[in-house]
Amino acid sequence: FRDQFIIPADKVEAVITESVAECRRRTRAHISLPDNEATSLNMTTGKHWVGFAEFQGDSHTTVHINRDVPIHVERVIQLGCHEAYPGHHVHATLVEAELVRKRGWIEYAYIPLHGSQAVIAEGAANYGVDLAFTPAERIAYERSVILPMAGLDGEQLELYYRYFALLDQLNFARNEVARYYLYGGMPREQAIEWLMEFGLESRGTASQRLDFIAAMRSYVINY
């Protein structure tokens, strides 16, 4: 059922670009940002993550998207909001503008991947979708813009989101799998089966998630 909403690989870059632009428009209507702020999109492969925001400084961020991972429709806005507007890019841009430049707190020019700021940064980025879109606005935008761009049918979109809301309640199964896989000696194949059974993930998604868990370890609790 879920896989009918996978964005075709040759459409991913276009729909992510559109999503980031819409998230930017909505964010700038409420948050003042430097005139020169901008993001650029880089499509890549061979990574353990789906999306990654690399702040370059001077109010610019490169948003990397991993082509290897299937992108379902809900991830399009999620990636645009989480990685860019009003998520990681906006957070880093405001930290640079308010703390580094205005106050001279140069230590904030360094953004550690693992550190005390991670919980705040990821929590704020996760909340980005809800700041930018109401549930009704999100569905309307996906049905009228994203799905047509991707060549997908939106007839069952509401049903899909009811399913996805239930799926989201299984999120903490990932932390349990991470705990057993990293520290309890759980074999990789068993961990994949757990994610499939208790997290209702496909084998491909479960395998990619384990790669992320292995690389990022306890960082995964930030999500």
Give residue spans per PLM region.
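N-terminal maturation segment of proteins
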Residues: F1-Y223
